[in-house]
A protein has these predicted regions:
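Short alpha-helical donor nucleotide-sugar binding micro-motif in glycosyltransferases
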Residues: 53-54, 61-66
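A short, well-ordered alpha-helix in the C-terminal region of glycosyltransferases
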Residues: 133-149, 158
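Glycosyltransferase donor-sugar binding loop
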Residues: 20-34, 52
């Protein structure tokens, strides 16, 4: 989905010169060079930071200074990085191929759309159209979504309940 995000960001960034994108994560497949070339061709290279894999305080710091987290993934079994963003109170913009999209949508913890450039553009535009109060409310809902669904204590309680039900 990184290619989709670059295409969508290029379209949306034309409307707001303040936008900046951080493309963080490991380059396990050597795809970063191709993505950087795509960013050059789209004319957005100067508006993107490529820190690579972020860990520890660097990762958490990046989450906390971000306004929103965007993952237009083609396929995610769970999306731990989405849960991490929610834990930091960051709304998420994800594709409907991230397997926790229903929880995000049900809890109003972000926006969900198709796994396409158009869907990613819609997510970004919806995000940018929020009023400050709406942004604050969605941030609160993002954190609440994490606490109620993905916090380790809550997950352990659900697992124990599933086991109890299965042995009765």
């Amino acid at each position: 989905g990184c290619d989709l995000l670059l295409e969508a960001f290029a379209q949306v960034a034309q409307q707001d010169s303040r936008l900046h994108l951080v493309m963080a994560g490991p380059d396990q497949t050597g795809w970063a060079a191709t993505l950087k070339m795509q960013a050059e061709e789209l004319g957005i290279a100067e508006r993107i930071t490529w820190p690579g894999m972020l860990q520890g305080d660097d990762k958490w710091g990046a989450f906390y200074v971000a306004e929103v987290f965007c993952l237009p993934s083609h396929q995610e079994n769970f999306g731990i990085v989405v849960a991490e963003a929610l834990a930091c109170g960051k709304p998420v913009l994800i594709s409907n191929k991230v397997n926790i999209w229903r929880e995000i949508e049900n809890d109003s913890a972000g926006f969900v759309d198709d796994d396409t450039v158009e869907g990613t553009v819609r997510n970004l535009q919806r995000w940018l159209s929020l009023q400050p109060k709406e942004y604050v409310r969605m941030s609160e809902k993002a954190r609440a979504c994490f606490e109620s669904r993905f916090h380790i204590q809550r997950a352990a309680e659900r697992l124990v309940e599933i086991i109890r039900c299965s042995i009765q």
